[in-house]
């Protein structure tokens, strides 16, 4: 059997991808489409981890003078002989990524931008030896290598590089700017947004508007920033967002591409799982998967077929927008709470989406937060109903898990503020007052989002209520609470050792799909008895065990109690 190609986890260099024999999902049709559409300045916005940086590297590798044509052998674009003859390896390219332009202060971030320019100038170091550049040109180029770049030089740096490259190669220049919006996002987080907007606007205006050496430019980012903030005065400026049909297959993996990848690695039987967890993003007219998720899942399961799916995407960001959104849902926003509950449970909401906000506006209102959730990939569209109004859903199980985890996290933070109620609930359990505990637990459930999605399996629903219960019990002092502890013939949901007391508690949580809470409680009590969950407590010296069954359905619950003495 031939050796399989390596999976490209974290590989963003097209050249490395091809030379080192990584598995590559062919996106070179983007080159053909770009040239056919022909925009002078083109901005593509997609959520994180959808292959933007790799695509930009592919453009640079294709267009730049001295390109290795063999890297495109067997790929889609190699079939278009006319384009290859006219464009492959024919143009100077300025290519930068603003991903690392960050800092606690404006000066720190500015210094990062200077380093980005320095790095690109060093990559184009051959300009300093060019016989076609004057001494003045070369002195100007030396300034682009300086770590102490003046403001005027920094603002015109990409323009100057373009002009010098055109002089040297006698060809117009292609400009590629990856992650264009990262400096703005970081500036907004750290309090120097206005200064950074001014700097980025000056750099972009010079290179994209007043640049006679420009062939065309491509920019990528996560969000479409209001044109008035940094793209002022650009006339031939095209934006392709997640709602646009043009270029809809160029970012992310299509269903056919995922099937082919899984088949190549012998993972065909995992298709339905991968689809449930990582598909569902709607770009234009196409449903796509998150490449980062698919590749990581495939890699993990080549090593261990029995591994459960993971939330890979969540680890690539702080997920701040979800935290802000859920945290903003207070009593005045009861409708928003119901809408989020509907989404978590597999439904949809209709919202007006604004794609022309500044970073300052992203979190300024509930309406803007809906738009931000959509543009950053936490929600996706199932179609637009009228103008900018879209039918929004959670794309897949991974994102639903991320949102649910944040709901539970904030629920626990709220619980922490009310120690009196925590004590009341725990005391009710300890003093065998099941009816009081039932009322208090019902009150807790009214304040959070319930999981009743018909597409979510019963154990997943039970895990959610289990999480709520653990959130409450975890704040009770002197209680040793263990979850899914091995005991008897199986695993109890929750087991509690109450300080120095000779009383222990076993809790089994069930979800009543049909709403019959009492029947589900009886099943839970029988399960505790049949599997010997209490045995471990007796082995620890406990003489009395309180066996609680808690059945939940939507926001309703039933608690039943049986006691047992050793």
Features from the language model and the residues they span:
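Structural signature of nuclease core domains in nucleic-acid processing machines
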Residues: 434-566
């Amino acid at each position: 059997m031939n050796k399989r190609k390596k999976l490209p986890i974290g590989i963003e260099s097209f050249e490395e991808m091809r030379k080192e024999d990584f598995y590559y999902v062919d996106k070179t049709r983007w080159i053909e489409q770009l040239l056919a559409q022909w925009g002078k300045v083109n901005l593509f916005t997609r959520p994180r981890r959808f292959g933007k940086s790799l695509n930009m590297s592919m453009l640079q590798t294709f267009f730049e003078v001295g390109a290795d044509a063999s890297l495109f052998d067997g790929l889609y674009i190699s079939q278009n002989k006319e384009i290859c003859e006219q464009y492959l390896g024919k143009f100077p390219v300025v290519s930068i990524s603003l991903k690392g332009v960050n800092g606690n202060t404006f000066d720190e971030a500015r210094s990062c931008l200077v380093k980005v320019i320095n790095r690109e100038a060093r990559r184009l170091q051959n300009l300093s030896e060019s016989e076609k550049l004057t001494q003045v040109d070369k002195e100007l180029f030396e300034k682009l290598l300086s770590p102490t770049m003046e403001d005027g030089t920094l603002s015109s740096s990409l323009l100057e590089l373009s002009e010098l490259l055109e002089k040297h190669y006698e060809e117009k220049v292609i400009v590629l700017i990856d992650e264009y919006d990262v400096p703005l996002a970081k500036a907004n987080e750290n309090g120097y947004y206005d200064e950074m907007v001014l700097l980025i606007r000056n750099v972009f205006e010079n290179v994209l508007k007043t640049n006679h050496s420009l062939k065309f430019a491509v920019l990528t980012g996560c969000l479409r920033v209001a044109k008035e903030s940094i793209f002022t005065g650009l006339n031939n400026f095209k934006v392709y967002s997640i709602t646009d049909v043009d270029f809809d297959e160029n970012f992310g993996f299509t269903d056919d591409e995922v099937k082919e990848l899984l088949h190549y690695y012998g993972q065909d039987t995992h298709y339905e799982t991968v689809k449930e967890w990582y598909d569902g993003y709607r770009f234009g007219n196409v449903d796509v998967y998150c490449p980062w998720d698919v590749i990581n899942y495939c890699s993990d399961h080549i090593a261990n077929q029995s591994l459960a799916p993971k939330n890979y995407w969540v680890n690539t960001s702080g997920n701040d927008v979800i935290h802000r959104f859920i945290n903003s849902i207070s009593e005045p926003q009861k409708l928003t709470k119901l809408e989020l509950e509907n989404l978590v449970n597999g439904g949809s909401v209709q919202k007006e989406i604004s794609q022309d906000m500044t970073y300052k506006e992203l979190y300024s209102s509930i309406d803007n937060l809906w738009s931000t959730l959509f543009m950053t990939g936490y929600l996706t569209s199932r179609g637009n109903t009228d103008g900018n109004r879209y039918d929004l859903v959670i794309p897949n199980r991974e994102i639903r898990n991320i949102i649910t985890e944040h709901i539970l996290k904030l629920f626990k933070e709220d619980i922490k503020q009310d120690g009196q109620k925590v004590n009341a609930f725990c005391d009710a359990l300890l003093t065998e007052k099941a009816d009081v505990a039932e009322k208090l637990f019902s009150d807790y459930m009214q304040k959070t989002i319930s999981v009743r999605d018909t597409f979510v399996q019963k154990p997943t629903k039970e895990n959610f209520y289990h999480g709520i219960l653990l959130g409450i019990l975890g704040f009770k002092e002197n209680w040793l609470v263990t979850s899914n502890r091995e005991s008897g013939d199986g695993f109890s949901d929750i087991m509690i050792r109450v300080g120095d007391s000779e009383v222990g508690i076993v809790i089994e949580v069930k979800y009543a799909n049909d709403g019959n809470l009492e029947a589900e409680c009886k099943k839970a009590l029988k399960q505790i008895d049949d599997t010997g969950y209490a045995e471990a407590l007796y082995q620890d010296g406990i003489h009395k065990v309180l066996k609680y069954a808690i059945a939940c359905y939507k926001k309703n619950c039933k608690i039943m109690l049986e006691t047992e003495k050793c």
